[in-house]
Amino acid sequence: MGRTPPVADNHGHVNPVKGLGPREVARRFRRTGGWFMGVVALLTWDLDLRPGDLNDVDRLYRLTIESARVIQGEGVRSVAIIGLHPAECVRLIEAGWGLDKVRGYMVKAIDLAAQYIKRGEAVGIGEVGRPHWDVGSDVIKLCNEVIEYALTVAKDLGAVVHLHLERAGEATVKSIVEIMNKVGVRDRGKVILHHASPGMVKPGVENGLTPSVPIGRHGEFEEAIRQSRLIVVESDYIDDPRRPGAVIPPWRILSRVNQLLQLGIVNEDDITSIMVDRIEELYGVKCS
């Protein structure tokens, strides 16, 4: 076995308010072969911001963008993906907001993200989508409308979208493809199935989407790679000191990759394709 290729994290979070923060995360990741990290907006309340306040949404976006800049400054390529998690919808409904008001608020949050993307400060919208837990059909309908709007805006901007969804295999993928067809999404590879289950990989790839597979969940990458090599991987790191073992941190991706190489589950060409080639194609960055 030769030199291990550089490793990438397609979807992770950093918390400059309560966590290790972008600088320390970047330094740890770089020391362990990390070359790229997609930095995705956290929930507003993770940063002591108020759900339902567009001014605080703007602060959330600016903190995410600045975190990506700090990571870039530490020698790890980084891009910002900004938007509101579907849990924000649920939180506002629980607070007594009507569905129309929540919908309007989420649309404004996407429009705000679009302004940053137009200026080149962010590259995508996310994570938007549907709750992965049980909610009422009215909430699902609302979230689907938000997804449709996000895909429409992203299509016009040429931006990526990180979708947070339930993990129901082909049924989940089919529902997203229907929305994409309605919108007329052309570059389907820019629609990223965040936290994709193995059952979402084959139908996702067959429909041109990009499954982003959590590399730290036991057995899931191994099953996913049997379905297709046309994937990316993520840590979904949350940078929460209260939950240090919730997910794999970015700086442990390399050891996981080495384990997979030693077991013969993947080879170096597979890792280069997943960790370098696919990331370069998605985000227009270069690993050097």
Residue positions per predicted region:
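Active-site gating/metal-coordination segments in enzymes
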Residues: 53-152, 210
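Mid-to-C-terminal alpha-helical segments outside catalytic/metal-binding sites
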Residues: 254-288
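Divalent metal-dependent hydrolysis catalytic cores, especially in the metallo-beta-lactamase
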Residues: 6-17, 24-59, 73-88, 123-124, ...
